[in-house]
Amino acid sequence: GKYMYHADHIAVGQVFLDMYQKYHDRNMWLPTLARTEFVINHPSASTLELDYRNMASLERWSWCDALFMAPPVYAKMYMLTDDWKYIEFMNREYKATYDYLFDKEEKLFYRDHRYFNQKEANGTKVFWGRGNGWVLGGLCEILQTLPRNNMHRQFYQDLFITLSDRIIQLQGKDGYWHASLLDPDSYPSPETSATGFIVYALSYGVNEGLLDKATFMPAIEKGWKALVKAVEKNGKLGYVQPIGADPKKVTREMTEVYGVGAFLLAGNQIYKMAK
């Protein structure tokens, strides 16, 4: 179909591959196997210049959210099959997106190429909170999949540490990370999907010994307490920016499933930390 290559539509493969590892039912992984085989055997010739009017531009990881959605699937397929084609494809495509969207001065990811020359109200570059949260979350999934002695792991581990070191500097005094990482004054409301993914990543990093506990624990504790404050008595998580691509205003009434997912990922790491 027209979404055969689309990262958002392969992300569910992560869950099915995890289920296959638990239940050993081949029916759980065959659709993901077929899809990844097709993508690798028929690589897209598209550029990384995202254009929603051109579906071909969505065939590659041309927006930073995609680095959460698709690469972990290929990492898991590599570990399940021991077939190098999966890790070679992931490395090639991930590094192409990194080279294109990662700003080496700010050490943050642009959401996509449309933001290269845009500026926030305060004159800074546009770096989206949730977008960088997606990247950090995806790196966690890759690092949890590739063993520490795997030759392909170092690039992702180094990037995880670099991005974590930068992101900790951008936490608000209220404990949240905001929709705009460099212009929080223009978007002062909490944003819990970005905060959830970031707390998840930083907690994972500390738990795995990748990040210095003394340096990162204060930010983790502030971030987790902030997330808990955003939960209503009925369990609803508020302040989740709706589906989008750049910083927007957020209200307490706003919620989305990916925000809850990020909260649960963070909570899982906090629980491990407390045990």
What residue spans do the PLM features occupy?
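CBM-like carbohydrate-recognition segments
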Residues: 1-7, 13, 19-30, 42, ...
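Structured, active/binding-site neighborhoods that engage oxygen-rich ligands
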Residues: 10-19, 57, 72, 115
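Active-site lining segments of carbohydrate-active enzymes
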Residues: 58, 72-84, 91-92, 96-100, ...
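Flexible, glycine-rich active-site loops centered on histidine and acidic residues
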Residues: 41-76
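Alpha-helical scaffold elements that line and support the substrate/ligand-binding pocket
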Residues: 13, 67-80, 136-143
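Structural helix-adjacent loops and short alpha-helical linkers that scaffold large soluble proteins
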Residues: 19-37, 77-91, 143-162, 168, ...
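Solvent-exposed loop and edge beta-strand segments that line ligand/cofactor-binding
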Residues: 1-11, 53-67, 118-137, 148, ...
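Long, well-ordered core segments of solenoidal/helical folds
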Residues: 1-2, 30-50, 84-110, 157-175, ...
